[in-house]
Amino acid sequence: MKMKMKFYYLSLSALFIFLQSCDNEEQEQIETNVVEEIVEEEVDPFYAGINENSTLDDYWDLFVKDAIRSGKADPGFGRTINLFFGSEPDFASGVTADHAGRAYDICNDETVSFEIIESFWEDFSIVQRLYTFYHEAGHARYKYRHPYEASEVTSRPEEYPIMWLSMAAENSTFEEFIKDKNNFFKRNWENVRYFNCSED
């Protein structure tokens, strides 16, 4: 009888361990599937071609396609495009350390020209690169100005539009970029301003 009880308890223990093991494998599979679904939802296939090795020209091509799909009639066709990397000393002429780029020749309707500080770009995540690129393209192509000058800012806004700063926070998410980018193309942010390019 004692032997039967031992066998019974051993069998019961083995069954419990087997069922627990199956439950853990099933739980891991469910968790893996959920994580994969979340990752797939976060990456818009439109941006899938951009990676750590993408060039400024790749970002420009993406910007143009994005502008078109957002309803912009002329994202810059027929213009001379001049995108390049600069270095920090290039910015010694009054541009502050919270800027990662600079637009040139903004009032010339035949060009789109801007530079991005290469050392910043190399350290940026893809989301930060998207923010910086769209910010500088906003100056160079659409003549957007920053919503406020530094001297006018008395408190931080609740939301930071793409044209607020050319350097997005490290923890900026892809979802935030998509929302801000949509507002960017719709000109939907507080205090939209343009460079004055009228000839006096």
Give the ranges of each region predicted by the language model.
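Bacterial Sec-dependent N-terminal signal peptides
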Residues: M1-V35
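Metalloprotease/metallohydrolase-associated module, dominated by Zn2+-dependent proteases
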Residues: C22-E31, V35-F63, R69-G76, A97-I106, ...
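Acidic helix-start/capping segments at beta-turn-to-alpha-helix junctions
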Residues: F77-S93
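Short pre-active-site segment immediately N-terminal to the catalytic Zn-binding motif
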Residues: E115-F133
